[in-house]
Amino acid sequence: MNKPDTAIEAADVIEAEANASSTVVQQKSWKDYLTLAKTGIVTSNLITTFAGLFLAATYIGVSLSDYFLTIVWTMVGAALVMAGGCTLNNYIDRDIDHLMERTKDRPSVTGRFSGQHILWTGFVQSAAGIFFLLLTTPVAAVIGFIGLFVYVVLYSMWTKRTTTLNTIVGSISGAVPPLIGWSAIDGSLHSYAWLMFFIMFFWQPPHFLALAMKRVEEYRRAGIPMLPVVAGFEMTKRQMVIYVVALTIVSLMLYPFGIIYTTVAAILGVGWLALGIAGFKMKDDVKWARLMFVYSLNYLTILFVLMVVVHL
């Protein structure tokens, strides 16, 4: 695998940080902080956090109106923990993000923020998030910390640049939001909470591998061993289909949610599986990957919103 020129990378990063530290011409804005926090990721994960919270209240028989502050602390805490993890990820990846089209304009790359500023911003966000989760239950705070540790240390600092298993490791951290939401109400974690965790866990590989296929040359240039880079598209497609099958099975294990949920979950799963299998015949792999990526976003939103709606 071709590795990026680390000497040039280091020089670019040092120069950018020096410029950011020595001048006040470039004024920081809230938009820059939101970019570092990856608000798209945070927002989508807050949907699953709320679903966990709502379902926990439903199944232990309490009214959400009696847990107003718990809802606030949970959503704010989860958002800050996720934002902190994403900001720290920006700090860690600032030496390679300039090699990728979708990340080259991040404040961590352009020099608008110094590396030290990004690092401290991530630490403060993460600590504040854990604190707010602690105001709900210790279990929620511990789960939040575990998710943060897995994402920042095990994924960003270790496996992302060393193994194709990076996607699996990242999927663990990405699957904890429903657990955070549920444990903020009920620390015992019902089996439904764990099924929601596994839905998130199996959803992420086909989602992120589709993105990796779309951006395969960028990942190759950055030296990141994503599966499409190391094993090629055919192997990646097979892996994606396997995960979609597992996801569909797990989602249907929540059949006690009712016939409407079960029917829609089955349709969503079979539809995604059909699209996945079609990829073996499509000539345009990038177009197929784009379709898989968009489908994954719709799948997640519809499924978790539906979990809430059928319990209203």
UniProtKB/Swiss-Prot annotation:
<keyword id="KW-1133">Transmembrane helix</keyword>
<feature type="transmembrane region" description="Helical">
    <location>
        <begin position="240"/>
        <end position="260"/>
    </location>
</feature>
<comment type="function">
    <text>Converts heme B (protoheme IX) to heme O by substitution of the vinyl group on carbon 2 of heme B porphyrin ring with a hydroxyethyl farnesyl side group.</text>
</comment>
<keyword id="KW-0350">Heme biosynthesis</keyword>
<dbReference type="GO" id="GO:0008495">
    <property type="term" value="F:protoheme IX farnesyltransferase activity"/>
</dbReference>
<comment type="pathway">
    <text>Porphyrin-containing compound metabolism; heme O biosynthesis; heme O from protoheme: step 1/1.</text>
</comment>
<feature type="transmembrane region" description="Helical">
    <location>
        <begin position="165"/>
        <end position="185"/>
    </location>
</feature>
<dbReference type="InterPro" id="IPR006369">
    <property type="entry name" value="Protohaem_IX_farnesylTrfase"/>
</dbReference>
<keyword id="KW-1003">Cell membrane</keyword>
<protein>
    <recommendedName>
        <fullName>Protoheme IX farnesyltransferase</fullName>
        <ecNumber>2.5.1.141</ecNumber>
    </recommendedName>
</protein>
<dbReference type="InterPro" id="IPR044878">
    <property type="entry name" value="UbiA_sf"/>
</dbReference>
<comment type="subunit">
    <text>Interacts with CtaA.</text>
</comment>
<feature type="transmembrane region" description="Helical">
    <location>
        <begin position="291"/>
        <end position="311"/>
    </location>
</feature>
<dbReference type="InterPro" id="IPR030470">
    <property type="entry name" value="UbiA_prenylTrfase_CS"/>
</dbReference>
<dbReference type="InterPro" id="IPR000537">
    <property type="entry name" value="UbiA_prenyltransferase"/>
</dbReference>
<feature type="transmembrane region" description="Helical">
    <location>
        <begin position="262"/>
        <end position="282"/>
    </location>
</feature>
<feature type="transmembrane region" description="Helical">
    <location>
        <begin position="139"/>
        <end position="158"/>
    </location>
</feature>
<feature type="transmembrane region" description="Helical">
    <location>
        <begin position="68"/>
        <end position="88"/>
    </location>
</feature>
<feature type="transmembrane region" description="Helical">
    <location>
        <begin position="40"/>
        <end position="60"/>
    </location>
</feature>
<dbReference type="GO" id="GO:0005886">
    <property type="term" value="C:plasma membrane"/>
</dbReference>
<feature type="transmembrane region" description="Helical">
    <location>
        <begin position="113"/>
        <end position="135"/>
    </location>
</feature>
<dbReference type="GO" id="GO:0048034">
    <property type="term" value="P:heme O biosynthetic process"/>
</dbReference>
<feature type="transmembrane region" description="Helical">
    <location>
        <begin position="193"/>
        <end position="213"/>
    </location>
</feature>
<comment type="similarity">
    <text>Belongs to the UbiA prenyltransferase family. Protoheme IX farnesyltransferase subfamily.</text>
</comment>
<keyword id="KW-0808">Transferase</keyword>
<dbReference type="Pfam" id="PF01040">
    <property type="entry name" value="UbiA"/>
</dbReference>
<keyword id="KW-0472">Membrane</keyword>
<keyword id="KW-0812">Transmembrane</keyword>
